[in-house]
Amino acid sequence: MEPKPFFLCIIFLLFCSSSSEILQKQTYIVQLHPNSETAKTFASKFDWHLSFLQEAVLGVEEEEEEPSSRLLYSYGSAIEGFAAQLTESEAEILRYSPEVVAVRPDHVLQVQTTYSYKFLGLDGFGNSGVWSKSRFGQGTIIGVLDTGVWPESPSFDDTGMPSIPRKWKGICQEGESFSSSSCNRKLIGARFFIRGHRVANSPEESPNMPREYISARDSTGHGTHTASTVGGSSVSMANVLGNGAGVARGMAPGAHIAVYKVCWFNGCYSSDILAAIDVAIQDKVDVLSLSLGGFPIPLYDDTIAIGTFRAMERGISVICAAGNNGPIESSVANTAPWVSTIGAGTLDRRFPAVVRLANGKLLYGESLYPGKGIKNAGREVEVIYVTGGDKGSEFCLRGSLPREEIRGKMVICDRGVNGRSEKGEAVKEAGGVAMILANTEINQEEDSIDVHLLPATLIGYTESVLLKAYVNATVKPKARIIFGGTVIGRSRAPEVAQFSARGPSLANPSILKPDMIAPGVNIIAAWPQNLGPTGLPYDSRRVNFTVMSGTSMSCPHVSGITALIRSAYPNWSPAAIKSALMTTADLYDRQGKAIKDGNKPAGVFAIGAGHVNPQKAINPGLVYNIQPVDYITYLCTLGFTRSDILAITHKNVSCNGILRKNPGFSLNYPSIAVIFKRGKTTEMITRRVTNVGSPNSIYSVNVKAPEGIKVIVNPKRLVFKHVDQTLSYRVWFVLKKKNRGGKVASFAQGQLTWVNSHNLMQRVRSPISVTLKTN
C-alpha cells in the first residue's frame, strides 16, 4: 500500500525536529470517523486500524518491530478506533489525518482501587447515594474470621473514624509482634485461635511447616486482603506496582473491624472457628464475614452452620463464601438458610498483556506484571512448550523443567496442580525469561491474574489452543508480551467466575444456593509488608496492595454492603437485610444483557438471585422476614431428627407438634425452590412480605413461569396501607401434562416479581427453581 501524500509531508517536517524525547513511546487512543469510506477497502476493521499505525511509523524511526506489535486494541462499539503504543511524533502525524477524530494520551481518569466499590455504585448519587444514606457504615462492627491482619496497613488507619461503639466488648489480644496498641478506632479488636491447629500439627509431625506469627498478625495476606475489602479506610494513590492506580476503599469505610485469626498455614480447624464465633457473639459484632469453607456437608455436621445459628439469633448477619470448586454442579458450600452464601463475579476492569506471535497474530491475555516500566519485558523470544514424561513439565512444577531447553525462552505453562505464581517461579529457576499461562478446558476463559515474578500473561482456553497449534507447526516459534496497563469499562461485566461454586445444594436442596454473586475476580486490596505480592517466599518485592481472586473476595464485598444496610436500618433483622440484597440483585450486566456463565446466560444455580446491587438494596420496598423459630420449623419439614435439630439450633423440640401447628409450612425465603417428587403434579408455597417503603403502596405480581410449569399466584395485588405492614400470598406450581410421567429428572427456572404500581422501577424479584425427581 502506497503512503498517503499528507503523511509524507508531515513525516518530513517531524523528521527534522525528531529527538530522543519524541521517540519515547506511550499509549494513545486514536478515535476514527465511524463512517469512513476507506474502511471498506480493507478486509477487516483490524487491518484498517493497523494501516494508520503503519503509515505513522513509516520514516519516523528505524523500526525493528512490526507495527502490529504496538496495536493494543481495536475498538468498534464504544468508539471507532484503536489504542496503540506511539511516540509523540507518530501521534502528531495521526492528528493531521482527515479520518482521525482525536488522538488522546491514555491518562488514568477516576480509576479506583478497589475499583469494585465504584463498579457497585457506592460512591454515586450525592446525598441520596448508599454511602450517604448509611453514613459509610458508621456504628457497625464487622467481625472477620480469616488469617489475621497486618495492622500497620494504611487501610486500617483510623483518621476520621468515630469513637468505638459502647456496646463493644472485645479486646486487642497481644501476641508475637502484636501489642494492644496495634488496634485503633478502625481496627477495634483482634484475637487469634490456634489450639485446634496446634494439636493437629505438632512440630514433630510437621517439621517443615512454615514459620508464622503466633498472634493475630497475618502471615499469609489473605485476612488482610479480606478485612480491607470489607471496611478499609480510604487510601490515595493505591496501586499494585503501578497498575490499578486510584483510591482504595472498603465497602463500608466508616465501619469498625474486629479480626479473628482462625486460619493458619495448614488450614482452618473447626474447633478454632467455633471458638471465634463464640467469642465474636460475646464481643457484640453486627456482621460476621467468613471467607472460608469446604465441601458440602449436612447442616448438623457443619460447624459454621451450627455456630452461626446462634449468631443469627442474636441479630448478627452472617456472610460466607460459596467456595471455589466451580463449575462443578452441587459444589456450593455454606448452605445454611440463615447465612448469605456468596458466589463470585467479574469486574469491567482489565489488565491487558497481549501475546504477539512472530507471524503477527495477537492472543489476548492479562497480567499485573509491571511490564511498561521494565527494560526488555516485552522483547520477542523463542517459545517452548515442554510435554511428555511423568515430571509434570506441562504444568511447570518446580524441578520439572529441563534447564538446557528452557534457558532464555518463553515457557507455556498449563493451569492446574500448582499455583499460578509458583509456575512462574519454576520457570525463572530453570532459566526461562517469560511465561504464558495457558487455561485448560477446565478453566475455559477464566482470567484470574497475578503479580508475576517474571514477564508473564494468562490466556484463555481458546487462545491457548491457537498458541499450541502455532508452536507445534513452527520450526522456531517466537512471541512477545505487550503490557497494556489498566483498562476500565471496555468489557462485559459482571460475568460468573469459572471457579465460583455452583448449586443445587446437596445438603439442603430445598433452598436455592448460592444466594447471590459479588465481585470476586482480580480484586485489589491491602497486603502485608512481610510478603511479596505473590506471597511466595522468594518474592522480595514489597507492596501495600495486591490482587487476589476467589469467593473469599466476593464474600467481604457483601459483608461490607450488609453493614451499610444495617447502619441505615439498625432495627432490621439479618433475614430482612439479606432479603433486600437478594430481591434487588441484577440479572443483567452493564450492557443490559443477561449475565453470562461462560458462553451461556447464567442460571440460578450459578448466580442465585443475581449480582448484588447496593444502590437498589438500600431501598428494597418489600422484604421477606424470617424469625429464628421459623428455621426450626423448616428443619422439621426436612425430616431431621430431634438430635439433629438440637445440634443445629440448641433447641430440644418435638417436630410432630411443630408440624401439626404449621401444616404446609414453607420457609419465607427470598428465593423459591420447588421439588416435585415422583407422582406429584402440584406444589404450593406461602410467602409473607413486609412493606419497608412508603405507606399506601400497591404491588402487582409479574411471573415468568418455568418451562413446563403453570404458576398461579393469589392474590395478584398487594395493597399496603402503612409501613411495616405484612401481607401474605400463595403460589401454586402445576406440572403441565406433557411433563408428567417422565423417566428422568429435569430442571426449569423462572422468576416471580412484585412491581410497585407507583414506581415501576421498584421491583421485588424472587428467582424460581423447579426440579422434577423420579425417585
UniProtKB/Swiss-Prot annotation:
Residues 388-470 form the PA domain. Its main location: secreted. Its EC number is 3.4.21.-. It comes from the Eukaryota. The keyword Signal applies. The active site is at 146 (charge relay system), 222 (charge relay system), 552 (charge relay system). Residues 116-618 form the Peptidase S8 domain. It is a peripheral membrane protein. Induction: Negatively feedback controlled by components of an SDD1-dependent signaling pathway. Repressed by GTL1. GO terms for molecular function: serine-type endopeptidase activity. Mostly expressed in leaves and cotyledons (especially in epidermal cells), and, to a lower extent, in floral buds, stems, and siliques. Strongly expressed in stomatal precursor cells (meristemoids and guard mother cells). It is found in: Secreted, Extracellular space, Apoplast; Cell membrane. Residues 1-20 form the signal peptide. Keywords: Apoplast, Cell membrane, Glycoprotein, Hydrolase, Membrane, Protease, Secreted, Serine protease, Signal. Pfam families: fn3_6, Inhibitor_I9, PA, Peptidase_S8. Belongs to the peptidase S8 family. This is Subtilisin-like protease SBT1.2. The lineage of its organism: Eukaryota, Viridiplantae, Streptophyta, Embryophyta, Tracheophyta.
